[in-house]
């Protein structure tokens, strides 16, 4: 798979491939598919990009309490989904297809800034995450993130993350 520039109507990463890279599992795995991915190839002129999505269903555990009579997908879950998509972008930019490397690495998010929630996300929505690399130096990544439902901006944030060695605890 050439991940330097991959796009189209078919997913380039399904949930099985995502689970090989991210350590998250149900109920906290918040990316269902990756539709587009451009590896970041330049630190001086960042060009990395990812488009991924999560299908929000009424079966999400979070709706048991948020809110039972008017379910709204929490903003914090939207940000976590953005962070997971950003982790995929950073990992693939650094290690390509080498999913074996994922066992030794973990992505930590350091800051989340300029968060805005614009429109509620509800069951039945497809939450589309679009992230681009703003800056990259070594293992540190700064990402601009937007989330959309039906092409309407529902939330946005700037994220800073680092990829580091995973330590056994």
Swiss-Prot record:
- From its record, what is one biological process in GO terms? fatty acid biosynthetic process
EC assignment: the record states: 4.2.1.59
Active site: residue positions: 66
Q: Tell me a Gene Ontology molecular-function term this record carries.
A: (3R)-hydroxyacyl-[acyl-carrier-protein] dehydratase activity
Query: Which Pfam families is this protein grouped with?
Result: FabA
Q: Identify the keywords attached in UniProt to this record, alphabetized.
A: Cytoplasm, Lipid A biosynthesis, Lipid biosynthesis, Lipid metabolism, Lyase
Query: What's the catalysed reaction?
Result: a (3R)-hydroxyacyl-[ACP] = a (2E)-enoyl-[ACP] + H2O
Coiled-coil regions listed in the entry: none
Q: EC class of this enzyme?
A: lyase
On whether Lyase is a keyword of this UniProt record, the answer is: yes
**Which CDD domains does the UniProt record give?**
FabZ
Q: Which domain of life is it from?
A: Bacteria
Q: What intrachain disulfides are recorded? A: none
Where found? Cytoplasm
* One of the record's GO cellular component terms: membrane
Q: Which NCBIfam families does UniProt cross-reference here?
A: fabZ, PRK00006.1
Give the protein's function.
Involved in unsaturated fatty acids biosynthesis. Catalyzes the dehydration of short chain beta-hydroxyacyl-ACPs and long chain saturated and unsaturated beta-hydroxyacyl-ACPs.
Q: Which family does it belong to?
A: Belongs to the thioester dehydratase family. FabZ subfamily.
Official protein name in the record:
3-hydroxyacyl-[acyl-carrier-protein] dehydratase FabZ
């Amino acid at each position: 798979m050439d991940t330097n520039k991959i796009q189209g109507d078919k997913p380039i990463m399904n949930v099985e491939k995502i689970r090989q890279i991210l350590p998250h599992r149900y109920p906290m795995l918040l990316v269902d598919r990756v539709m587009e991915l451009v590896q970041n190839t330049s630190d001086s002129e960042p060009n990395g990009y990812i488009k991924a999505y999560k299908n929000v269903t009424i079966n999400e555990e979070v709706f048991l309490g948020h809110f039972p009579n008017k379910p709204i997908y929490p903003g914090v879950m939207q940000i976590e989904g953005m962070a997971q998509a950003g982790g995929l972008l950073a990992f693939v930019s650094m290690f390509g297809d080498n999913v074996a490397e994922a066992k030794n690495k973990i992505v930590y998010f350091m800051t989340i800034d300029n968060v805005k929630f614009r429109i509620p996300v509800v069951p039945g929505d497809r939450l589309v995450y679009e992230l681009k690399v703003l800056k990259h130096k070594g293992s540190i990544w700064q990402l601009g993130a937007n989330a959309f439902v039906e092409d309407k901006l529902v939330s946005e944030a700037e994220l800073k993350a680092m990829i580091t060695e995973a330590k056994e605890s």
